[in-house]
């Protein structure tokens, strides 16, 4: 388990040994915060958002810096694809970058439709879809192969949020896309991806999501957890999915 905050270092927690290790500051780097990161699906690489357009690649095994990637603008969001062999990034220049981690090269860069500054990214488990979120609350959903092939228009533009897009997640079979805004009370929506319609009956009037900060689906999408600014984690059962 990796834990980080607005510090020059992060923590690695070994669940088996119940041991905590402090990692950093990273040699040769001047980042004052390592609060934003993503772990690859194969658990080999940790990618941290760095300063001045840099993405820091850390070995999950050794916890050492193994490389950097450089965007033209600031980095705001990261998402792995292709089982951890590729990385997507977005930020201040409004572009979505695709990186091949084997060569540490940018293999594709294109504008996110209608975005001036990208602040959120997520990919589906099979990497066929990805979603981008912007400061205007707009979420674009793309078919990744089409985007890489030069098609710039998203499959769908979702306009149900009105402030900065925060955490986004596809569930395991990419039937549901959860989107949030941490600046909006109850600022979370569940989108049915095949029809791109928003579930109007969720979470319902009896439940308050406060200001959502983070979320995740269980491996089989039987459960959805949401953490909010009030310091609580809410657990929901999704009855459509039989397996947890």
Language model: regions and residue ranges:
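Conserved beta-strand element within WD40/beta-propeller blades
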Residues: 2-4, 46-49, 88-91, 130-134, ...
């Amino acid at each position: 388990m990796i834990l980080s905050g607005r510090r020059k270092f992060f923590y690695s927690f070994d669940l088996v040994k119940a041991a905590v290790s402090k990692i950093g500051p990273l040699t040769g780097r001047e980042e004052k915060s390592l609060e934003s990161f993503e772990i690859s699906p194969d658990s080999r690489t940790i990618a941290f958002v760095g300063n001045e357009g840099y993405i820091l690649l850390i070995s999950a095994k050794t916890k050492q810096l193994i490389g950097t990637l450089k965007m033209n603008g600031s980095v705001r969001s990261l998402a792995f694809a292709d089982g951890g062999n590729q990385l997507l990034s977005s930020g201040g220049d409004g572009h979505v970058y695709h990186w091949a981690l084997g060569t540490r090269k940018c293999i594709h860069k294109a504008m996110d439709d209608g975005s001036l500054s990208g602040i959120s990214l997520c990919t589906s488990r099979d990497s066929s879809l990805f979603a981008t979120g912007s400061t205007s609350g707009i979420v674009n959903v793309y078919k990744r192969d089409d985007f890489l092939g030069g098609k710039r228009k998203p499959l769908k533009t979702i306009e149900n949020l009105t402030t900065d897009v925060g955490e986004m997640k596809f569930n395991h079979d990419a039937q549901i896309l959860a989107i949030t805004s941490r600046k909006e009370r109850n600022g979370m929506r569940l989108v049915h991806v095949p029809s791109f319609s928003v579930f109007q009956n969720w979470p319902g009037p009896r439940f308050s999501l406060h200001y959502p900060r983070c979320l995740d689906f269980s491996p089989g999408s039987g459960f959805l957890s949401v953490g909010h600014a009030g310091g609580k984690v809410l657990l929901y059962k999704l009855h459509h999915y039989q397996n947890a």
